[in-house]
């Protein structure tokens, strides 16, 4: 809801509510797929979502929008940029890893590790950036971020990856450190992408639901690229 209000405040309620329902359903079915025990092919649970996609195209024929192409773009960007990454968090909890891991159908440790890497990356980047940051990372998008802060956050994440490797053996040390690097780098890109979105729309915060901290997008921006990147890493490079 926050995203769609941000990108298009004047959109039709028919579109706004259908986009929210579509995104919510996409997150739900992505969480359901790893637990699908019945013989029902997975494609059947996507049918309502396919109906939403068809509706999104057809409804524009009957609404007098000034720029329906932009409206379509906003609708589908919300699905890909917000709903899909959130739904993919379930695939982090159910990755096809080593035999020891497969004995446990669900294990929250990778999800906890995922968020711990994001947190330590932000913390490390802030500490190092405030202390010695001089060279701007992306001045035209986010002037406060520095290369020193970026590498500081990455170093903190790699160190935490090593700590995780000493406690959890279902990934070896190299895999843990690789995972920490992936989350660190892509969470930084996620932060930059959300800042580019706000700069393009000429807004400071994505919302005001969290006083003093902006909106939910401002708090979750690191997830939106780190989640898909983590799934790719786990499924293609480790499994």
Which residues fall in each region the model found?
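Membrane-embedded alpha-helical bundles of polytopic integral membrane proteins
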Residues: 1-181
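Active-site alpha-helix of zinc metalloproteases
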Residues: 117-118, 183-187, 214
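Juxtamembrane interface at the ends
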Residues: 125-126, 130-131, 195-203
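Hydrophobic transmembrane alpha-helices of multi-pass small-molecule transporters
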Residues: 157-158, 219, 226, 235
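C-terminal transmembrane helix pair
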Residues: 198, 223-225, 229
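Interfacial loop-to-transmembrane junctions
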Residues: 200-222
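Juxtamembrane boundary at the C-terminal end of a transmembrane helix
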Residues: 232-239
């Amino acid at each position: 809801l926050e995203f769609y209000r941000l990108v298009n405040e004047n959109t039709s309620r028919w579109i706004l509510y259908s986009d929210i329902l579509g995104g919510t359903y996409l997150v739900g079915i992505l969480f359901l797929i790893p637990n699908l025990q019945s013989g029902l092919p997975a494609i059947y649970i996507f049918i309502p979502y396919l109906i939403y996609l068809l509706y999104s195209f057809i409804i524009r024929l009957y609404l007098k929008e000034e720029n329906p192409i932009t409206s379509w773009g906003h609708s589908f960007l919300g699905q890909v940029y917000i709903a899909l990454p959130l739904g993919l968090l379930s695939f982090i909890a159910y990755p096809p890893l080593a035999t020891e891991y497969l004995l446990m159908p669900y294990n929250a440790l990778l999800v906890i590790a995922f968020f711990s890497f994001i947190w330590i990356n932000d913390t490390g980047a802030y500490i190092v950036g405030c202390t010695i940051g001089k060279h701007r990372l992306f001045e035209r998008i986010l002037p406060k971020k520095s290369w020193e802060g970026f590498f500081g956050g990455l170093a903190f994440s790699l160190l935490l990856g090593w700590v995780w490797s000493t406690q959890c053996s279902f990934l070896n040390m190299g895999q843990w450190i690789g995972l920490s690097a992936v989350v660190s780098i892509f969470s930084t890109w996620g932060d930059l992408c959300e800042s580019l979105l706000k700069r393009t729309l000429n807004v400071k915060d994505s919302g005001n639901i969290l006083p003093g901290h902006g909106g939910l997008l401002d708090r979750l921006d690191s997830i939106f690229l780190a989640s898909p990147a983590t799934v790719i890493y786990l499924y293609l490079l480790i499994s």
